[in-house]
């Protein structure tokens, strides 16, 4: 009985090694949460490049206005 369990455990470890399980240290950092923690909003971040849309006529219905 024990040899069957040992063989089954060996086969399972060969097919699915423990190194295939993702650990918390393998996860990428959340840069957005890190920026918000530093107090820099995404709109004020130096890498943020907003697209400016301006209206040529009166600014009644366009957003954002110049």
Curated annotation (Swiss-Prot):
Subcellular location, record wording = Secreted
GO cellular component terms listed in the entry, alphabetical order = extracellular region
| Propeptide feature: residues | 21-53
Instruction: State the organism named in the record.
Output: Conus litteratus
InterPro entries for the chain: Conotoxin
Family to which this protein belongs: Belongs to the conotoxin M superfamily.
4-hydroxyproline is found on 64
The name under which this protein is listed is Conotoxin Lt3.5
Respond yes or no to whether keyword Membrane is given for this record. Answer: no
